[in-house]
Amino acid sequence: MKKNISRNPLWPDWYNGKKIDEVQFGRAFLEQWPLKCVNSTLYTLDGPVEDESEIKQRILENIEEYVTSGLSKKVTNILETIKLLAFSDPFPIEQDCIHLQNGVYHLPDGTFQESRLFCQNRLPVKYDPKAATPDRWLAFLHELLDDADIPTLQEYLGYCLIPSTKGQKMMLIVGKGGEGKSRIGLVLKRLMGDAASNGSVQKVENNRFARADLERRLLMIDDDMDMNALPKTNYIKTIVTAEAKLDLERKGVQSYQRDIYARFLCFGNGALTSLYDHSDGFFRRQLILTTKDKPADRTDDPFLVEKMCAELEGILLWCLEGLHRLVQNDFRFTVSERAAANVDTIKRSSNNVIDFMESEGYFRFKADYSISSKEFYDIYKQWCEDNACHSVSAIRFSAELRQNDRRYNLEATNNIYLPGGRRVRGFVGIEPLVHPCP
């Protein structure tokens, strides 16, 4: 005969003296600590929960006196029940507002609403329209960058505050080392919290699991970029200009598709290069800023980051100013002559066919002349030898010319005739001035 257990009035509603009603507990828990669950990720009003251990600890504190065995398993089961009860459709990707610690900033009209709503990302900084000008931050940037490049940085950092890839750019800040450029990344991590992550561009391109780490992120910071040339660039280019869902993989999980809007901010001692991709598309996606040389008599301040982080509210206003300017310019960045030259220099250094085509004394452009692909490639190899350069392959050389035929007023043809009536490939519009020995 079962023994009835008299109910203790001090017991919570979800406990009957023998077991915990997980559904009832979950509902009571959600009333006290509101949560939503989107794609198996829990969200609080502060944004996504990166570590569920705190929630598990809260569950434990509530049930530990009612469970005598299997406590850890019970906590895990209740957490899964809470996720089911908190199910929500994905949050909208809001490109016109920014969720901040004390409310929502509306980008179209610059108004601020003091309310906290569930959202994909919440930045851990308060909006204060009367915040002081971030003098230490601005002084640091003036010491680090050319004045003409600071508006570009301002626009890009503002761009990173919203989940949008309309700018279709990634930013690289390049120096010789020791300038303090990576301090920018540390300040941004404090400004953006978990919406910014540290990572590696090389890893994103080459590791199929690394791209999933960009999910829900506004920014990925690579504070010591690997200088090895990328073997491929497909994923980097796709992420920078992403307009559709990307296929992501996690270990032990079936691949799935998500919207990715993370931007890249990279710091290094050289630019990002590719072994095989030397197209305009690869370089067009890059904003490259170069730092000033570190003054020989400068004494580094070990508390510089802390001093700049004390100005976060002012830095936020500064970033918003850049974002408004970018939006008004239809997401076209302000690019100084120096920054534009940086991209051109990097492009030339990775593709010496450009310099060859602008050289003198080896050939000249003449509409009524033609040259075979082999003869033109031999002239190019002679130029490389004279200039101590490595030559590209014959296939790539011809491909570069065909891709840029309009730029050089050339016409690719299959009707170049050699002695003996042999018909070969070549180009119309080139007169050779040298004839290297075969």
Identify the residue ranges that each predicted region occupies.
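Feature primarily recognizes SF3-like P-loop helicase cores of small DNA viruses
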Residues: 1-38, 64-438
